[in-house]
């Protein structure tokens, strides 16, 4: 019996490490449903909501503070059992702008003024995005035993997410399965001018799967940092952020680059008790480092109250973070920025 279990374990390990044999197998989801629920390996089910921008940069300082506070409350909605991802996609637009200018003609003497104003607005739109179409998405997921269990839970989370966006004054729309497939298709076919052609009724008629409609000709991941999708090359970068605070302009300045790219923030909320315990442990470690530095100072014959600036900064930041977690109901997040 023990031998059989060992053999089964080896087979499972081999299955996990087995390389994909096709472009379709490389795409890491199990099933996409018409209502937008996507099943991932490991029993994780996700949904995606597309949302639009908010006029944060041009708002007054008071309004910016209110927007920032509302966004912080929005992020605090997600607990440790609800991982989520923010995706920002910049792609070159080959079709008409998503923003349309429609000033109808009237039976008066001002049609020439209307035409001039319409032309000016269209030029402003064209110059503002440099042909780059910028889209924003939030994807959230829950573990579940099956689609029947996952669907109502995801619908409740989706309603809460959209309600939070509404309170922020941000237009948003849930994405169904076709919309999510179209987004994946655009990501895997950069520069493609052909529209995404797909219908759910084609699945039983053709015997194809959803991945067959979105997969490129090939994937090539043989290089350490570069990759190839079809005929296009891409690269993946990550940010190692050492600053204790970040400017609220960081993400905006990255997304304003005149380039096709995808920026993702993979966010996992840390359990509140675990976060507090972690910070207390860090504070204890910093305290030990202070004692060690003071001992060194005494042995060297100089003032033990003079500590390295970095140590003072770390101590202050850790104390402030602990106060935020304990008294202000803030949350700690694990963030991967790619």
Regions found by a protein language model. Name each.
Residues 1-338:
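Extended, folded cores of ATP/NTP-driven motor/assembly subunits in large transport
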């Amino acid at each position: 019996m023990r031998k059989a279990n060992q053999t089964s374990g080896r087979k499972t390990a081999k299955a996990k490490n087995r390389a994909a044999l096709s472009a379709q197998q490389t795409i890491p989801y199990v099933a996409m449903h018409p209502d937008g629920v996507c099943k991932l390996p490991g029993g994780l089910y996700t949904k995606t909501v597309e949302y639009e921008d908010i006029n944060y940069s041009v708002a007054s300082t008071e309004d910016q503070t209110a927007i920032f506070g509302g966004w912080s409350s929005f992020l605090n909605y997600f607990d440790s059992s609800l991982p989520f991802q923010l995706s920002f996609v910049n792609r070159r637009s080959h079709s008409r702008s998503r923003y349309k200018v429609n000033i109808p003609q009237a039976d008066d003497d001002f049609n020439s003024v209307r035409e001039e104003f319409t032309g000016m607005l269209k030029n402003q739109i064209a110059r503002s995005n440099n042909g780059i179409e910028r889209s924003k998405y939030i994807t959230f997921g829950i573990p579940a035993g099956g689609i029947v269990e996952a669907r109502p839970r995801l619908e409740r989370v989706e309603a809460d997410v959209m309600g939070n966006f509404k309170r922020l004054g941000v237009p948003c729309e849930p994405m169904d399965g076709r919309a999510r497939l179209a987004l994946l298709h655009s990501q895997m076919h950069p520069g493609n001018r052909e529209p995404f052609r797909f219908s759910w009724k084609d699945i039983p008629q053709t015997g194809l799967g959803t991945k067959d409609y979105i997969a490129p000709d090939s994937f090539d991941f043989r290089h350490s940092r570069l990759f190839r999708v079809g005929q296009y090359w891409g690269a993946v970068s990550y940010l190692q952020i050492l600053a204790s605070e970040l400017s609220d302009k960081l993400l905006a300045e990255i997304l304003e680059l005149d380039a096709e790219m995808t920026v993702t923030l993979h966010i996992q909320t840390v359990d509140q008790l675990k976060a507090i315990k972690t910070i207390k442990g860090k504070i204890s470690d910093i305290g030990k480092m202070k004692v060690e530095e003071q001992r060194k100072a005494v042995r060297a014959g100089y003032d033990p109250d003079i500590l390295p600036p970095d140590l003072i900064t770390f101590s202050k930041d850790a104390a402030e973070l602990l106060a935020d977690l304990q008294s202000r109901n803030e949350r700690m997040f694990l963030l991967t920025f790619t």
